[in-house]
């Protein structure tokens, strides 16, 4: 799949100049590739565990401590964020995300087209901008892992990087959920062992508007920040 940065480099250059000069970019090192591998491992490990346990197991806090920790985290109001470049990149990222979801494979036998409601697209975009606001390279420094929660397991769908030439400075794991009203459809999709594959997509499934984003700074030892929406 062509990188998002290559596809939109011409339009991005006209919006504004880069937030961080090339000389200020983080040095390329082994942790850049290690971050990508870690993101894939995180999504893979979720496939055999309850996604809800991710909040406590990764943060190092119990339910009460974790809640109080998040209460103390201060993020800027979205109205105060005004970065034309990041907003432009975010719109392109959401387009690439929807394309990746339209080619998702939840089960091992049949593909499915996962659809994001417009409300979900808007909410995810705003949350990514909020989490990227304090980063040295903004949204360009993000490595986005996309997972879809199904019952007590998660399926890794995609890993997206806005600028593959830039060593990522922070990692976001986006956990989406299937609409619970579609359970009969989902069960039929995953249990169709004897049905043969046909070209195209057998099912179109709508995602719930609820989601979770887990942020990890790759240049810091800070605790994971978990945003539940």
Swiss-Prot record:
The main location is mitochondrion
Q: Give the record's keywords alphabetically.
A: Antiviral defense, Apoptosis, Cytoplasm, Mitochondrion, Phosphoprotein, Ubl conjugation
One molecular function GO term is: 14-3-3 protein binding
GO biological process terms held by the UniProt record: brain development; cellular response to dexamethasone stimulus; defense response to virus; intracellular signal transduction; intrinsic apoptotic signaling pathway in response to DNA damage by p53 class mediator; negative regulation of glycolytic process; negative regulation of TOR signaling; neuron differentiation
Tissue expression per record: Ubiquitously expressed.
KW Ubl conjugation (keyword) present = yes
* KO phenotype (gene knockout): No visible phenotype. Mice are normal and less sensitive to oxygen-induced retinopathy. Mitochondria show increased production of reactive oxygen species. Newborn mice show increased radiation-induced apoptosis in brain and thymus, due to increased levels of TP53 and increased TP53 activity. Likewise, cultured embryonic fibroblasts are highly sensitive to DNA damage caused by UV irradiation or doxomycin and display increased levels of TP53 and increased TP53 activity, leading to increased apoptosis.
Specify whether Nucleotidyltransferase is a keyword of the entry.
no
Q: Where is the composition biased (Low complexity)?
A: 9-18
Q: Where in the cell is it found?
A: Mitochondrion; Cytoplasm, Cytosol
Superkingdom per UniProt: Eukaryota
- An example Gene Ontology CC term for this record: cytosol
One short Pfam family name for this protein? RTP801_C
**What is stated as this protein's family in its record?**
Belongs to the DDIT4 family.
Write down the PANTHER family for this protein, in alphabetical order: DNA DAMAGE-INDUCIBLE TRANSCRIPT 4 PROTEIN, DNA-DAMAGE-INDUCIBLE TRANSCRIPT 4 PROTEIN DDIT4
Q: What is this protein called?
A: DNA damage-inducible transcript 4 protein
Q: Which organism is it from?
A: Mus musculus
* Gene name in the database record: Ddit4
């Amino acid at each position: 799949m062509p990188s998002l940065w290559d596809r939109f480099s011409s339009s991005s250059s006209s919006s504004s100049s880069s937030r961080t000069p090339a000389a200020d970019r983080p040095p390329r090192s082994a942790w850049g590739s290690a971050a990508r591998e870690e993101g894939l491992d995180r999504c893979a490990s979720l496939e055999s565990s309850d996604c809800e346990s991710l909040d406590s197991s990764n943060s190092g806090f119990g339910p009460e401590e974790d809640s109080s920790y998040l209460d103390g985290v201060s993020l800027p109001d979205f109205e105060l964020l005004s970065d034309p470049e990041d907003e432009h990149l975010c719109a392109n990222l959401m387009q690439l995300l929807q394309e990746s979801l339209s080619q998702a494979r939840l089960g091992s036998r049949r593909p499915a087209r996962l659809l994001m409601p417009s409300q979900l697209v808007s909410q995810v975009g705003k949350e990514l901008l909020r989490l990227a606001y304090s980063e040295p390279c903004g949204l360009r420094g993000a490595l986005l892992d996309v997972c879809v929660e199904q019952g007590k397991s998660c399926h890794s769908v995609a890993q997206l990087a806005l600028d593959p030439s830039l060593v990522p400075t922070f990692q976001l794991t986006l956990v989406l959920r299937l609409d619970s009203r579609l359970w009969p459809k989902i069960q039929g999709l995953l249990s169709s062992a004897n049905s043969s594959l046909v070209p195209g997509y057998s099912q179109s499934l709508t995602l719930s508007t609820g989601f979770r984003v887990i942020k990890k700074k790759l240049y810091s030892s800070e605790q994971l920040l978990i945003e539940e929406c």
